[in-house]
């Protein structure tokens, strides 16, 4: 079952996002199971990430194998985890961009 995942990190920056995203290879080597990914600046600062994944397992595999190591490499230790809102997707349309 496809899932959507929303994270809002008011104490983060787009610069940190760009660095960690690059280290995790999100754009250069999209993770297996990723359907859709966006990152945007929150009003007043911070970062919002919205993803759609083929399954919760695909997201958790990416998180363990690529995201957490990239975060450790960038920050030295893991920052407090952001709240994640994960929901099952009822309907998904992906027209060409």
Predicted regions and their residues:
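Short S/T/G/P-rich N-terminal loop/turn motif that feeds into the first structured element of a domain
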Residues: 1-50, 54-66, 75-97
